[in-house]
Amino acid sequence: MAAITISSSLHASASPRVVRPHVSRNTPVITLYSRFTPSFSFPSLSFTLRDTAPSRRRSFFIASAVKSLTETELLPITEADSIPSASGVYAVYDKSDELQFVGISRNIAASVSAHLKSVPELCGSVKVGIVEEPDKAVLTQAWKLWIEEHIKVTGKVPPGNKSGNNTFVKQTPRKKSDIRLTPGRHVELTVPLEELIDRLVKESKVVAFIKGSRSAPQCGFSQRVVGILESQGVDYETVDVLDDEYNHGLRETLKNYSNWPTFPQIFVKGELVGGCDILTSMYENGELANILN
């Protein structure tokens, strides 16, 4: 989840491309995203949408219709009915009425409720600005106006919007990389491929030899295997048997090693469990959970 770089003037450049934010030492970095769905994804504030000038002015006027942060009523979060399930900008205050975070959401009530469950000590009240036409440009402008106002008054960014503060921000977990058994097909191995396979399955709790990667399986059986292992919350390794660059010769070598003719193949604690059908059966009857624990 990317951060948003904002200079002291909070000026956005007119480029439609998503660019990697450049952060100088003196440039505050603040975060727009809510931890909880439904929120919008804005990779950076160093861009605007490809609008005409009238369109940009229209977005500004719509966003400006939202009351200023100071003028907006502070609502107790405990009174759930008072928080609308609408799109817009919202500001979370702690029990001492100190601003903690400014975010945007398609459902403000749901986002605030989720914040309350996650960090109740930081959620005492909330200010809400409903945006009638919640496209990205309008919501960004409304959020920007509230942030600008707070910085102008206090000289600082709300804690939850600072770079590195993930209290209110959902972090997308990085998927584990797939194992590459060799440095490349044109590199001569000093250890036989079968020995590399043997080391891997014996030194890892769970290894799945699949078609494709864990993030993009190339067959339904491999996708099913990844889904089952993910559901178990187990740490597991994946090896792409279709990767002829870094796993060249793996398919035939693995068939000989395991004496199993098809893929995917799943090993648990050094022993072959079988393929997708067997793993699915073990998952459904509870046996898989037992051998993984």
Curated annotation (Swiss-Prot):
Its EC number is 3.1.-.-. It comes from the Eukaryota. Disulfide bonds join 123-219. One of its GO terms (molecular function) is metal ion binding. Glutathione binds at residues 211, 251, 263, 276-277. Keywords: 2Fe-2S, Chloroplast, Disulfide bond, Hydrolase, Iron, Iron-sulfur, Metal-binding, Multifunctional enzyme, Plastid, Redox-active center, Transit peptide. GO terms for cellular component: chloroplast; chloroplast stroma. Residues 194-293 form the Glutaredoxin domain. [2Fe-2S] cluster binds at residue 219. InterPro entries: GIY-YIG_AtGrxS16, Glutaredoxin, GRX_PICOT-like, Monothiol_GRX-rel, Thioredoxin-like_sf. Changing residue 115 to F: Strongly reduced nuclease activity. The formation of an intramolecular disulfide bond negatively regulates both the N-terminal endonuclease and the C-terminal glutaredoxin activities. Changing residue 111 to R: Slightly reduced nuclease activity. It is found in: Plastid, Chloroplast. Its main location: plastid. Residues 1-62 form a transit peptide. GO terms for biological process: monoatomic cation transport. May only reduce GSH-thiol disulfides, but not protein disulfides. Participates probably to the maturation of iron-sulfur proteins and to the regulation of the redox state of the BOLA proteins. The GRXS16-BOLA1 heterodimer binds a labile, oxygen sensitive iron-sulfur cluster. Able to cleave linearized DNA in vitro. [2Fe-2S]-bridged holo-homodimer. Interacts in vitro with SUFE1, BOLA1, BOLA2 and BOLA4. Interacts in vivo only with SUFE1, BOLA1 and BOLA4. Interacts with SBP1. Belongs to the glutaredoxin family. CGFS subfamily. The N-terminal domain (NTD) (63-170) has an intrinsic Mg(2+)-dependent endonuclease activity in vitro. The glutaredoxin (GRX) domain (194-293) alone is able to complement yeast grx5 cells in vitro, but not the full-length GRXS16 protein. This is Bifunctional monothiol glutaredoxin-S16, chloroplastic.
